[in-house]
C-alpha cells in the first residue's frame, strides 16, 4: 500500500512571519508571537486561556497531567500512530491500552474502545491517520457516556 503524504503548504504570509521571527532572533518556542497567538486562539475557541507547546508530545503530556492521569491509570490509544501519542502516557506513569484499528480507515474501532474501558481508564486519545478522521461522533458518545475525557 502506498500512502500519499503532501509537502507543507507555506504561502507568502507564512514566509513573512518566519522572516520576522528570524529577524527578532526568536526562532523557538518563545518570542513575541507566542502570547499573541495564544490570545487569538483562546478567543477563537471561546475560552479564557490557551497554552501553546513546542510539540504534540508536550501538548498531550500537559493535558494528561492536567487531567490528573498518573500511575495505575490507563489511557486508550491506537496501535497505529506516531510514538508521540503514546510516550506521554508513560511519562505520567499510566499504562497505554491499545485498541485495534479498522484496516480500511486506520482508525480505532469505537466498539473496541468501549470494550477496553475499565475502572482505571482515565482518557481516550484518538488519532486521525493519513487524512482519515476517526468516527468522532461514536467516540464522543462513548467518552461522554462514561465520563472519560478525550484528547484530540
Regions found by a protein language model. Give the residues of each.
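N-terminal "arm"/small-domain region of PLP-dependent enzymes with the aminotransferase-like
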Residues: 1-27
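Conserved acidic
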Residues: 26-29, 33, 135
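Solvent-exposed, non-membrane alpha-helical residues enriched in polar/charged side chains
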Residues: 19, 23, 38-42, 61, ...
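PLP-dependent aminotransferase-like
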Residues: 65-152
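Phosphate-binding glycine-rich loop
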Residues: 30-74, 88-91, 98-100
Amino acid at each position: 500500500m502506498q500512502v500519499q503524504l503532501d509537502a507543507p503548504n507555506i504561502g507568502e504570509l507564512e514566509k513573512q512571519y518566519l522572516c520576522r521571527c528570524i529577524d527578532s532572533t526568536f526562532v523557538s518556542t518563545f518570542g513575541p508571537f507566542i502570547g499573541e497567538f495564544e490570545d487569538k486562539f483562546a478567543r477563537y475557541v471561546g475560552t479564557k486561556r490557551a497554552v501553546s507547546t513546542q510539540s504534540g508530545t508536550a501538548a498531550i503530556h500537559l493535558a494528561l497531567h492536567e487531567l490528573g492521569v498518573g500511575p495505575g491509570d490507563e489511557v486508550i490509544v491506537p496501535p497505529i500512530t506516531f510514538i508521540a501519542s503514546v510516550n506521554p502516557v508513560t511519562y505520567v506513569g499510566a499504562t497505554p491500552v491499545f485498541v485495534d484499528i479498522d484496516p480500511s480507515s486506520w482508525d480505532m474501532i469505537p466498539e473496541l474502545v468501549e470494550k477496553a474501558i475499565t475502572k482505571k481508564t482515565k482518557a481516550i486519545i484518538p488519532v486521525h491517520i493519513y487524512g482519515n478522521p476517526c468516527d468522532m461522533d461514536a467516540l464522543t458518545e462513548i467518552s461522554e457516556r462514561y465520563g472519560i475525557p478525550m484528547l484530540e
